[in-house]
Amino acid sequence: MTWNLWYVFGPFELRREAIRRVIERENPDIVCLQEVFCVRVGTEVRTFADELARDLGMNCFVSDGPWFPRRSSDEDGRDVGEERAMGNAILSRWPIESHGQVTLPGKDSDAGYRKAVHARVNTPWGAWPFVCTHLNHRFDESAVRVRQVDALADLIRDLRGNSDSDLPVIIGGDFNAVPDSDEIRRLTGRTEPRHANLVLSDVWEQCGDGSGLTWRSDNEYQADANWPNRRLDYLFVTWPRPKPMGHARRAWLAGVESEDVDGRRVQPSDHAAVVADFRVG
């Protein structure tokens, strides 16, 4: 499952319960989350992903920063030194053996603020690598996203291991790009990939039913969107892989409908989630 949670925007106190309900109902083994609300005061860090993991009985790894100061006062009016971050996270039903993050390039190839997090999960079928990311969002930043997917491909190559025998890498994220964009075509092999013998299978394209739109005009938060009705959120799995391990069997959307929270109908996020089942043998 992959889902952009829309940070702390909108009616967040209601949305956070709606988000929890959707994830609990879907009951996924792995969840890739973007725009996770993170707060740091001194050495204490609290994140919405950790909150979800506790509520759902899952393990969690959350990206670290970048942190931005936010003026916040205690009861006596003193600045508490609060910082906030918009993070990426991986939640897992099974123990996380190892984890890390990389910073993706920004404009002019400088280090940006977008990150990719990765976790190697101790599943019943062996150590399985997962990656979660969130790319730049502006319409005019396709070239930046191409550099970002190249950095992502470097990471995936290093995580993959032996493509003939090891478990494939599964990637989830908000790529802020439609399927025929240069950046997605580069990942899926429709143009020359970053690395020979490494392309990503688009799970929705292979087994999803319908358009798979995740940025939707029927979402109440999209009333003023410049370009609604796009498929921006993806689950990918690496190819080649030891078939049928990692083949996607079916894919569907979640979090599209509103939830009743405290007597009010609220949509969980401005994005729909993408959920899929994969073959494991």
Residue ranges and their predicted role:
Residues 1-5, 19-45, 91, 119, ...:
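Active-site beta-strand/loop signature of hydrolases that rely on acidic residues for catalysis
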Residues 9-10, 39-42, 69-72, 87, ...:
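Short catalytic/ligand-binding loop motif for oxyanion handling, primarily in non-cytosolic enzymes
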Residues 10-24, 266:
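N-terminal membrane-anchoring alpha-helices
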Residues 12, 36-131, 135, 253:
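Structured beta-strand-rich core segments of catalytic domains in phosphoester-bond hydrolases
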Residues 12-16, 109, 145, 149:
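A conditional alpha-helix N-cap/helix-loop micro-motif detector
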Residues 25, 54, 82-84, 110-112, ...:
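Extracellular/periplasmic catalytic domains that process cell-envelope and extracellular macromolecules
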Residues 157-170, 177-281:
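Metal-dependent phosphoester-hydrolase catalytic domains
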